[in-house]
Amino acid sequence: MSTAGRPHFGAFGSQPVCYHLPMTTTPADHSASGAERPASERKEPTFLFTEKYVADKSELARRFLDTRERLNANVDKANNFLVKRVYNIDHNAYLEGSLPAKTKELMGLVASACLRCDDCIFYHAIQAYRLGVTRAEQEESLNVALIVGGTIVVPHLRRVYELLEELYG
């Protein structure tokens, strides 16, 4: 009986073995494969606008940023190691690297819209604005979210379009 086209299973027969993935990688593997840049090569993005500027420009953004700051203070008081780790991973994921921070924020915007997280949508729309992403780029990204996420994304689009109107006019 031929096994062509079927995954090969390991010694216990329960987990497929993926022979196309290297078991270990070296820095040379990363550069050759185009994988993520090492941490030493990633850097903080350059924001064109401060959070204060955004808050002064948009009432929706101001309310969101104020609430986020207040709620984050409550989380910080808990001094939870795991939460700090997740926050750190999140921060590092959006640093400049092989992908520009603008692209990463638009990816975050699309994922957040598909997941229907209004706080996340507002956060990424504001960050993208601060990085100099145009309204057209944000709207085109939201079109992708609508296709991927389906019509259930529409109520969230309505809210973020209101924010975009306040930010971009």
Regions found by a protein language model. Give the residues of each.
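Alpha-helical scaffolds flanking conserved acidic
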Residues: A101-L106, A136-S141
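Aromatic (phenylalanine/tyrosine) cluster motif
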Residues: F9-F12, Y19
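Acidic, glycine/proline-rich low-complexity segments that act as flexible tails and inter-domain linkers
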Residues: C18-T103, H156-G169
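Residues in soluble alpha-helical coiled-coils and helical-bundle/repeat scaffolds
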Residues: Y94, L115-R116, V133
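Extreme N-terminal basic, low-complexity initiation segments
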Residues: S2-F9
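C-terminal binding/interaction regions
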Residues: R135, S141-V154, R158-G169
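Iron-sulfur (Fe-S) cluster-binding segments and ferredoxin-like electron-carrier domains
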Residues: H124-R135
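Short, thiol/selenol-centered motifs that function as redox-active sites or metal-ligating centers
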Residues: M107, A111-Y123
